[in-house]
């Protein structure tokens, strides 16, 4: 691929994550987008879950049973001349680590909000991560088919709670059973709420070109008045502010009834960025159109295909072109690897990928070479992208195999699930017992379920409660420092740390050993 072809291919890519609070409709809107891409023939619904027709992006057994996304799925499709990569992030708050890493691999985000509830805690947390990265955020106010909060309240809340300017691209004409349509500010038309797509044209003043019965409805008159108010007193549309994440375009609609979703997708593709540069550890920007291939591993997933017990490393391509069978260097080890087995995803289905370019997400079959955060490159110049953030756990549990005769599957399961970041592993410095660390309780439940379901290994979990993890320099360590209030353990890399039972125990330790330096992260 020559330089111009590479540039054209990269320009067509749109790679984004969908973020939301649980039950805001994230999976449903993902389904509708896949429908437009021709990937699925019908979108799943909440009711369909009970009949066994699960959402396409929820592939893991526990996700199907509980109706929550606990891993980040990757889906790719073509639409309107663009190659779209969607990363469907975990909606449950316990999976912030996986979500955070996923948000490092995208160029923009779509924030789905339940219009009956407004901004919820998980939405706020995920928004702040996107804002910190300075990536564009597009807002979809979902569930317009149900009665919800006043649209003006929702837009005001965006600005006041999240501290971002908002610009409505369309406006509801009624809601719930009284939903008559959408005033499409972006396309200067009315989108009627009918079984088949139907539009009414507006003149330059934003009024109907031809008379229509909808004019007599009070919801239409209210919408016209609110739109007029926003045009006078609201924010101005500003592409530059969208690009930096300072202004979020707001779309109203219903993912469940597929109303307003296509309008959103078309506008998103026009204003969302193509792949952007990534910084290496030296602070140098690696441009996506650079000829030399590079990328980083942001996720590892074991057992995506239970029949093969495989392990996939998810790679965000940052520059250049990927060709199957190419040789690359793994920066962490300096080892040369041949990328012969590569794949692209549609939840649990996949196909071999021959070529891909910057912006694409591909899966590499992994026999144990990769770790989360690894950089690979194909050029002569070594590249190491900025490290992905690690979260320090607050909840801990001691874990052991229920059946001592199944130690092999127990150890294999723990090794693989820890490598993919499902939980963090520690070892008691004295006894060698395994201790798991997690951000939230659900991570332990998922771990226990997957150990039994995927590795046929029942585990015994003993709660240790909340702890504060603090690392210590090995040269300052004395094993006598350990006590019941500050348990000495090793992390998976062999580095020593203490698990303090509370802040009082930590202060007591600091008073007794004033010269010992403790750190919150390795």
Swiss-Prot record:
Transmembrane segments: none annotated. Pfam families: EF-G_D2 (PF22042), GTP_EFTU (PF00009), RF3_C (PF16658). SUPFAM superfamilies: EF-G C-terminal domain-like, P-loop containing nucleoside triphosphate hydrolases, Translation proteins. InterPro entries: EF-G-like_DII (IPR053905), EFG_III/V (IPR035647), G_TR_CS (IPR031157), P-loop_NTPase (IPR027417), PrfC (IPR004548), RF3_C (IPR032090), RF3_dom_3_sf (IPR038467), RF3_GTP-bd (IPR041732). Residues 11-276 form the tr-type G domain. Increases the formation of ribosomal termination complexes and stimulates activities of RF-1 and RF-2. It binds guanine nucleotides and has strong preference for UGA stop codons. It may interact directly with the ribosome. The stimulation of RF-1 and RF-2 is significantly reduced by GTP and GDP, but not by GMP. Belongs to the TRAFAC class translation factor GTPase superfamily. Classic translation factor GTPase family. PrfC subfamily. This is Peptide chain release factor 3.
